[in-house]
Curated annotation (Swiss-Prot):
NCBIfam families for the chain: rplP_bact
Pfam families attached to this UniProt entry: Ribosomal_L16
UniProt keyword terms in alphabetical order: Ribonucleoprotein, Ribosomal protein, RNA-binding, rRNA-binding, tRNA-binding
GO cellular component labels: cytosolic large ribosomal subunit
Domain of life: Bacteria
Organism classification: Bacteria, Pseudomonadati, Pseudomonadota, Gammaproteobacteria, Lysobacterales
UniProt subunit comment: Part of the 50S ribosomal subunit.
Protein name per UniProt: Large ribosomal subunit protein uL16
Amino acid sequence: MLQPKRTKYRKMHKGRNDGLAWSGNAVSFGEYGLKATAHGQLTARQIEAARRTISRHVKKGGKMWIRVFPDKPITKKPIEVRMGSGKGNVEYWVAQIQPGRMIYEIEGIPEDIAREAFRLAAAKLSVTTTFVTRTVR
């Protein structure tokens, strides 16, 4: 599962996930990409599940890039614990996603296989996505 090796601080403020993706919004590495069309958070588990789905569908062919990394810790208090006594422990890690953000890229396979692989992977993700093709080489 993806998570940072070390961080400066263990816990993070909730923050706001506004605006559009100004960086990481173009197909930079591969031929085809899976692009987010809504705000949301992708957990490390979701990213890994979608990666496995893509890998299984394309089998040996092609090369894949994961363009997001879960670097935000999400905390949770244990069940049946009273309020107060500080912030809970880190439960899992998420990547914050804005509309336009490229999530996965792939190359070296036909478009129909890439489209189907991304369709199957999109079912594992909590944000709506669209299939995009590289415009300029």
